[in-house]
């Protein structure tokens, strides 16, 4: 089926459109401009042990995320695989038990039909579940939404995300004493991740 798909829809770079070998891959030039695996120390992020960033939010990567979130192009989410593959090769992660996606509001999910974070990361986690003993756990609830935060100042973001998340009651016990990996699509100030980490630590994670 893969060869038929490639025949009918020849694989192209998601940004510049030039031919590539496989669906979901980038041309070297476009990938080099946005691939940027780096680590931020924990002292910059209250409640977190650290933060891995996979790419620069610009150019082709910015367009890709925007299309998945706002232009109903969910199939484009597969184009993050080169970033996750490169991250895998670096063997960066400490031992973890559970991987939790940052949720979107119920209103946005009803409009969009999915949480883009699931599309970017869930398959990657499930493919490695046996090897790493990971479990994908959709344990967080986003209680409300007051619009997108990309235009807000750091102080406005902090006020916005305070008490923004809650934990699904059926998962409270499962979180106790566990090492967690939070995944999200965009990192700006870290306020969203810090807010999620705060409530998870209160639950004993």
How does the language model describe each region?
Residues 1-205:
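Glycine-rich phosphate/pyrophosphate-handling loop used in enzymes and phosphotransfer proteins
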């Amino acid at each position: 089926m893969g060869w038929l798909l490639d025949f009918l829809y020849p694989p192209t770079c998601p940004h510049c459109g030039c031919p590539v070998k496989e669906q979901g891959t980038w041309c070297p030039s476009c990938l080099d401009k946005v691939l940027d695996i780096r680590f931020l120390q924990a002292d910059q992020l209250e409640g977190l042990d650290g933060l891995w960033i996979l790419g620069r939010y610009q150019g082709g990567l910015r367009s890709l995320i925007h299309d998945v979130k706002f232009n109903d192009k969910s199939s484009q989410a597969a184009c993050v695989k080169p970033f996750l593959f490169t991250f895998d090769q670096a063997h960066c992660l400490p031992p973890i038990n559970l991987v939790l996606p940052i949720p979107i509001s119920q209103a946005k999910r009803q409009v969009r039909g999915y949480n883009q974070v699931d599309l970017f990361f869930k398959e990657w986690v499930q493919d490695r579940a046996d090897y790493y003993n990971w479990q994908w756990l959709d344990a967080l609830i986003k209680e409300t939404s007051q619009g997108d935060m990309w235009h807000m100042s750091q102080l406005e973001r902090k006020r916005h995300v305070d008490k923004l998340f809650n934990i699904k009651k059926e998962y409270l016990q499962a979180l106790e004493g566990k090492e967690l990996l939070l995944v999200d699509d965009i990192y700006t100030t870290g306020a969203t991740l810090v807010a999620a980490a705060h409530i998870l630590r209160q639950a004993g994670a």
